[in-house]
Amino acid sequence: MSLNLDKDNRDLSSNQGHLGEFRRGLENWPPGLVWQPDGEQIEAMVKLYQGVLVGNARLNLTRITAPLDFLEKHLWDSLAGVLLSDHSRNCPQARVIDIGTGGGFPGLPVALVWPQWSVALLDSTHKKINYLEELGHRLGLANLAYLVARAEAVGNQPQHRSQYDLALIRAVGEGVVCAEYALPLVKVGGTVVLYRGQWSAAEAEQLERACALLGGKVSATVAAVTPWSGAQRHFIYLTKEKPTPSDFPRAIGVPRSHPLGVEN
């Protein structure tokens, strides 16, 4: 699949109003995240939005395409998970992996805002990763890597296991499933960010039990309200305290079918 935004602009002629509304939203970025996009970042994010709209006409990248929804549920949410952590302030260099990136979130916005970080986009769907690679090149993002694989497989590969400073995982599965996918990939002392909507005490207890088996702990839970719709979001931060036992991650499909920490 070839990405040519000049050609594909014809397909977007009916969406010029959306692009304008999206740009205005960026130019009036809400306070609260101790970050504001500069002019170069605004232009890059408009191109990102445009590229996702083009890709969405061919692939099921995302159901979220309305300008303010995209700003809030993709850009704001993607960046909030990192900006509300210590990594945005204390890690001038970082190796990051976005597990189950789908349409490129949170990895693409993170790569745009932190060009000094190396960001790997991981997804099991070839067509999505192929398109994201073309979009990344169009955006000039030299700090991206692209992986087509299942998280369980990558977590057992020496070139990826315990190699990342930060793992981001959003809309992939239950919290305990996400922990089993992500903790094997980060270094001891590294951080996993789980992006969640509602978050219950029962889920928190299950996650604590799972993390204990995986060599990690829940270090923080941050609740936030989205700036446009007022929806509730939770960002769960896991810290890896010791190496994950070689038993984890388990075989492909097992973390989801038999989640850790869940009492039957």
Curated annotation (Swiss-Prot):
Family affiliation: Belongs to the methyltransferase superfamily. RNA methyltransferase RsmG family.
PANTHER family in alphabetical order: S-ADENOSYL-L-METHIONINE-DEPENDENT METHYLTRANSFERASES SUPERFAMILY PROTEIN
Keyword annotations: Cytoplasm, Methyltransferase, rRNA processing, S-adenosyl-L-methionine, Transferase
Compartments where found: Cytoplasm
Positions that bind S-adenosyl-L-methionine: G100, F105, D123, S124, T125, A151, E152, R170
One CC-aspect GO term: cytosol
Alphabetical list of InterPro entries matching this protein: rRNA_ssu_MeTfrase_G, SAM-dependent_MTases_sf
Enzyme class: transferase
Protein name: Ribosomal RNA small subunit methyltransferase G
Main location: cytoplasm
Coiled coil: none
Catalytic activity, EC: 2.1.1.-
Molecular function in Gene Ontology: rRNA (guanine-N7-)-methyltransferase activity
Function: Specifically methylates the N7 position of a guanine in 16S rRNA.
